[in-house]
Amino acid sequence: MTFPTLPAPIAAALEERGYAEATSVQAAVLQPEAAGRDLVVSAQTGSGKTVAFGLAMVPELLRGEERIGFVQSPLALVITPTRELALQVSRELEWLYARTGARVATCV
C-alpha cells in the first residue's frame, strides 16, 4: 500500500528515508477508521511500528498545515517502558517531523 496523502514535509521525510510504501502496520494505523482512536499494535522488530506511531499523530499535530506553529505546551506525550525505546521513538519522531518545525524533547 502506498502512503495516503500526507503533508508535504512528512511525505518528503519518508521519501528521504526510502519509504516507498507503507508497511502493513503503517497502513493499518493510517486507515480512516483508526483516526482518533486508541490503538494497540503488536508486530515484529523492523515492521515500522515506530514510524506508524509518528504517522498516526500527523492529523492531530499538523491539523492540515505543513508546519507546527509556536506553542507554549506539549502537543503530544509519549511514554515508553524503557530508556532505549524512549530514545528510539525520539530519534524517529525527530527525522519524521524535522521539516514541520516540531521540537522533540526526551526525558529518560
Sequence positions of predicted segments:
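Conserved pre-motif I regulatory segment
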Residues: 1-42, 59, 64
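The conserved Walker
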Residues: 43-47
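Walker A/P-loop NTP-binding motif
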Residues: 27-39, 50-70, 79, 84-87, ...
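Conserved nucleic-acid-binding Ia/Ib motif block in the N-terminal RecA-like helicase ATPase lobe
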Residues: 3-19, 66-108
